[in-house]
Amino acid sequence: MASTTAPSRTNSRVNYSNEIHDLSTVQSVSAVPSVYYPEKSFADIFPPNLLKKVISEVVATFLLVFVTCGAASIYGEDMKRISQLGQSVVGGLIVTVMIYATGHISGAHMNPAVTLSFAFFRHFPWIQVPFYWAAQFTGAMCAAFVLRAVLYPIEVLGTTTPTGPHWHALVIEIVVTFNMMFVTCAVATDSRAVGELAGLAVGSAVCITSIFAGPVSGGSMNPARTLAPAVASNVYTGLWIYFLGPVVGTLSGAWVYTYIRFEEAPAAAGGAAPQKLSSFKLRRLQSQSMAADEFDNV
């Protein structure tokens, strides 16, 4: 007479992913898959080049605020030296120069609202946002107080204040910052754009929009650029506008471009996935690599 044996049933405690699970039944024919969550190392959270990026943002934001607020201060004191158009051109040029100078190091954000938008749409790691903000406000504050020393006795150091109703200035700041961020996303986050023209495109956007925004709101588009001279000059009129406006403008500009852009076709089996580029990482190396590959295939 053949005997039958029932499958063995055991109660055990098995550790999966550092968690204890009580298993009422373990079948020998089926294995319970273990789940592994790799822990991020210190180098993943704080990469070795983070300090260099922070210093780059301090320098870039310092020069941005020093030049733009310096030009605005001289314009406010003597309009014959620098015109309103001259201020706009200066602002656009310094943005262009700083993108080419520091874009390959830190991304040349120079703007807390831009950093926030890049992080929100996953073009920049959230863990580095506080460091960038600290660098940007530090550079801006240093520039404002240096201007206070070298331009004495000028008391108003290029502050941005609304010339009319506050809601007029708020709408203007949202629109001009939207334009700046829309262009920025087009040339800095889309791999099909020509990276070498990123600085010229963004600088031109800043120049064009500040020409008509200047007489209404000052054309700040940057909370750090507004806060620093406000503290150095002790002028805080409508300060909230220049925090809310740029944040809304950059987030909406980035969202609209992200929504309307065409998605790249997925890579074929075994092929390389499309490269995701963030901030103002210029693409000279990418184009040189493609040229080298074409040369090798000849």
Curated annotation (Swiss-Prot):
Return the PANTHER family for the record: AQUAPORIN NIP2-1 (PTHR45724), AQUAPORIN NIP2-2 (PTHR45724:SF9)
Q: What is its main location?
A: membrane
Summary of the tissues where the protein is detected: Expressed at low levels in roots and leaves. Expressed in roots, leaf sheaths and leaf blades. In roots, it localizes in the plasma membrane of all cells of the young region and is more abundant on the distal side than the proximal side (at protein level). Expressed only in the xylem parenchyma cells adjacent to vessels in both leaf sheaths and leaf blades (at protein level). Is more abundant on the side facing the vessel (at protein level).
Q: Which CDD domains does the record match to this protein?
A: MIP
InterPro entries found in the cross-reference section: Aquaporin-like (IPR023271), Aquaporin_transptr (IPR034294), MIP (IPR000425), MIP_CS (IPR022357)
Physiological role: Silicon transporter involved in the distribution of silicon in shoots. Is responsible for the transport of silicon from the xylem to the leaf tissues. Silicon is beneficial to plant growth and helps plants to overcome abiotic and biotic stresses by preventing lodging (falling over) and increasing resistance to pests and diseases, as well as other stresses. In the nodes, involved with LSI2 and LSI3 in silicon intervascular transfer, which is required for the preferential distribution of silicon, such as hyperaccumulation of silicon in the husk.
Q: Which family does it belong to?
A: Belongs to the MIP/aquaporin (TC 1.A.8) family. NIP (TC 1.A.8.12) subfamily.
Residue ranges annotated as transmembrane are: 54-74, 88-108, 127-147, 169-189, 197-217, 240-260
Q: Would I find Cell membrane among this entry's keywords?
A: yes
| Span(s) of short sequence motif NPA 1 | 111-113
> Which cellular compartments is it found in?
Cell membrane
- Bilayer disposition of the protein: Multi-pass membrane protein
Stored PROSITE patterns:
MIP (PS00221)
Q: Which gene encodes it?
A: NIP2-2
**Stated induction or repression of this protein's expression:** Down-regulated by silicon supply in roots and leaf blades.
Organism (species): Oryza sativa subsp. japonica
UniProt-recorded Gene Ontology molecular function terms: channel activity
The name under which this protein is listed is Aquaporin NIP2-2
Q: Which GO terms describe its cellular component?
A: plasma membrane
Q: Where is this motif: NPA 2?
A: 222-224
Question: Which keywords label this protein?
Answer: Cell membrane, Membrane, Repeat, Transmembrane, Transmembrane helix, Transport
- Entry comment, domain topic: Aquaporins contain two tandem repeats each containing three membrane-spanning domains and a pore-forming loop with the signature motif Asn-Pro-Ala (NPA).
Instruction: State one Pfam family annotation.
Output: MIP
